Amino acid sequence: MSTSAPFHAPRTALITGASSGIGLELAHLFARDGYRLVLLARNRNTLRQIGDDLQARYSTTVRIAPKDLAHPASPDELYQELQEAGVLLDVLVNNAGFGLAGAFTQTSWAHEAEMLQVNVVAATHLTKLFLPQIRARQGKVLNVASTAAFQPGPFMAVYYATKAYLLSFSEALAEELEGSGVSVTCLCPGPVKTNFQKRAYMEGTRMMNSPLMVDVQEVARMGYEGMNRGKRIVIPGWKNQVGVQLLRISPRTAVTKVVRKIQEKKNV
């Protein structure tokens, strides 16, 4: 597996948060369809194993980028490395992100600042850096948000706000790029069966038993297909689609109170 050799491929995709969950499933879909990949995540060994597996399974080329997007310098470092290697992107997938559950008065600012950096700043920065070459190659941007983007989220206030930002950013950018040959898609899944809930300290919330849970492979497939069709927003699962439509016509205060009941710990 290459960590430094340049690519000479017609289609290359960068996927952040590629070591598990939606990002990993998307990596399989892109590799299956002949994309060469740049995979970004924090753990070098995990990335190397994933890269080796994808190369063997799909006969494609994988470049790993072991970086932590919580570090503000990471997007610039990656951009410079790819420039020096002659790698040009056709697709950017901003998938990296995490949540943090709890009352805002009790959660850690250090964790929330890191979440803002990863979920919002890094995704925006990477888009700013790579969009010129994606536009020149008439490529695509796929931002992974959440149905959390459509309403406030008491007891996950900052996380919900980061996803609302991603949705708004994606829709605005899609409109700016209308007619340019570049599509911007925002994937907004509901609860997904991944390690996200554990990292977000969501054990004990009603969300853990939500009937809206969708399989991660299905989420990735719908996001990938929606991106290829140039859809601006993709919401996997008919229950989630109906739910979002109801959110849009319901009083915001009432919606917020419902979300509070869902997010609150059962023993609170």
Describe each model-derived feature in a short phrase.
Residues 19-21:
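Conserved glycine-rich cofactor-binding loop
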Residues 127, 162:
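Active-site helix of classical SDR
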Residues 33-50:
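Conserved glycine-rich Rossmann-like NAD(P)H-binding loop of the short-chain dehydrogenase/reductase
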Residues 95-100:
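Conserved NAD(P)H cofactor-binding loop of Rossmann-fold oxidoreductase domains
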Residues 168, 176-239, 253:
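SDR active-site lid
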Residues 146:
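Residue(s) in the substrate-gating loop at a strand-loop-helix junction
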Residues 103-116:
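Substrate-binding pocket helix/loop in short-chain dehydrogenase/reductase
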